[in-house]
Amino acid sequence: MGTCLEVMKMKTLSLELAKLAMNLVEEVEKDKRDDYLRDVKGLGSMIVQNGLMGTILFLKKKGKNKVVDHLGKMIEHLTLEDGIVERLMENEFLDARTYLKAQIAALECAKWLKRCGEVLLGGEENETT
């Protein structure tokens, strides 16, 4: 079990991610909210199945730039690594440790984007109204 200070740091970081995700999701244009929500709902499983690089390439190819941008901003915030997504897109070498750190961060970020998306953009309970 971690010390009280470690637990407080984790809670603070989690709160920071939640706020960042909320701010990012709120900037999604009204006419793109349904697509964005659908994309972030599947983001975590996509990262698990295809890895971070595969997910980013797929999303870019499909024109899901807002999701990629938001994921990149959150990964940078969590890892303190600048331009991870851009570096991956430019095929810049990343050592295994940096890549895995970014991929683990991406999973945490995907969770917050999904949660905020469901709350702010409609979620399942509002799909029938």
Curated annotation (Swiss-Prot):
Signal peptide: none annotated. GO terms for cellular component: cytoplasm. The keyword Cell inner membrane does not apply. It is found in: Cytoplasm. Its main location: cytoplasm. It holds the Pfam family Cas_Cmr5. GO terms for biological process: defense response to virus. The keyword DNA-binding does not apply. It comes from the Bacteria. Keywords: Antiviral defense, Cytoplasm. InterPro entries: AF1862-like_dom_sf (IPR023101), CRISPR-assoc_prot_Cmr5 (IPR010160). NCBIfam families: cas_Cmr5. CRISPR (clustered regularly interspaced short palindromic repeat), is an adaptive immune system that provides protection against mobile genetic elements (viruses, transposable elements and conjugative plasmids). CRISPR clusters contain sequences complementary to antecedent mobile elements and target invading nucleic acids. CRISPR clusters are transcribed and processed into CRISPR RNA (crRNA). Part of the Cmr ribonucleoprotein complex. Belongs to the CRISPR system Cmr5 family. This is CRISPR system Cmr subunit Cmr5. It comes from Thermotoga maritima (strain ATCC 43589 / DSM 3109 / JCM 10099 / NBRC 100826 / MSB8). The lineage of its organism: Bacteria, Thermotogati, Thermotogota, Thermotogae, Thermotogales.
